[in-house]
């Protein structure tokens, strides 16, 4: 069995934690006003593309995808506070989903 075909909780959790780490890096880049912030948000967006292992977390990540996309757009438009708000909510939704998953 290929790793991507696994749908057990440890595999799903590992996948979500990887996305969570990209979100951490993107948000820290925003706070420090890194010149590479767009690249970091792009990495977070890229990690959200495609299906999750077994597709079981796709619905939850759809909201996160939308918020990250909006955050990137607001940041490009110079609306730092609104962008940070979107990114923080996306990050928190992801963290709460990981916590819920750990209770399965």
Report each predicted region and the residues it spans.
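Long, charged/polar, soluble alpha-helical segments
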Residues: 1-104
